[in-house]
A protein has these predicted regions:
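Mid-domain alpha/beta scaffold segments of enzyme catalytic cores
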Residues: 1-214
Length: 214
């Protein structure tokens, strides 16, 4: 079994299983031996020909699929078309469903930090919440860490933020970037002043612990 080094991408990897591919629940078609996350993205709550009810129905079925490792992207985005109250409702639905199905939650967040922290306090999840594509400053990273979040870094981020994240709360991802995950590991290792192989092994253990152990 391959443990993916890349926890969030929108592209199928050359070797199935090397990355967790993010999919919409209504269009999910898995590759043999691939790994996936599925969720209702805040951008597409209302801007889709598929109804929200149908998306929820598909999602509830897919979270029991053996190749689906995580819920997400779920999130809050003040630049999205859907109203913030509706986004909060859909996010809370997905967060509670992640708890019911024993899945970590991969989070898309834009300009809604306070709202997210309030929801975490309300829901009090047991399963990890992971901020994907974190680009904030170190002070924001510290706040997330105090509230128990994990952080995933992509191609662009604040170097000091990466440096302060404890090794057991760290992930790397390509998201929509064409930069290889190997290059991202090499850069992160240089920034954190740790050998690239050691960093990969640390993140591999994190992935195994968070995404595979039930």
């Amino acid at each position: 079994m391959i443990i993916p080094a890349d926890i969030h991408t929108h592209c199928q990897p050359e070797v199935p299983g090397e990355a967790i591919v993010n999919c919409f629940p209504e269009t999910f078609v898995p590759q043999l031996e691939g790994w996936y996350s599925v969720g209702i993205h805040p951008w597409y709550i209302t801007s889709s020909t598929v109804s929200l009810a149908e998306k929820k129905r598909c999602l509830e079925e897919l979270l029991y699929h053996p190749q689906v490792l995580a819920m997400g992207e779920a999130g809050l985005d003040k630049l999205a078309d859907a109203s913030l109250p509706l986004q909060r409702e859909v996010f809370e639905y997905q967060a509670r469903l992640a708890e019911e199905t024993d899945k970590p939650l991969v989070i898309h967040l834009v300009k809604a930090v306070d709202e997210l922290l309030k929801l975490k306090q309300k829901i009090r999840p047991v399963k990890p919440w992971i901020i994907h594509g974190f680009r904030g400053k170190a002070v924001l990273a510290e706040e997330y860490l105090r509230h128990g979040f994990h952080l995933s870094f992509g191609e662009r981020y604040q170097e000091e933020a990466l440096r302060i994240v404890p090794s057991d709360r760290l992930f790397l991802e390509t998201d929509e970037s064409m930069t290889s995950i190997d290059t991202l590991y090499e850069r992160a290792a240089m920034i954190s002043k740790s050998p690239s192989g050691e960093l990969r092994e640390t993140v591999r253990k994190n992935v195994e612990e968070i995404f595979f152990r039930r």
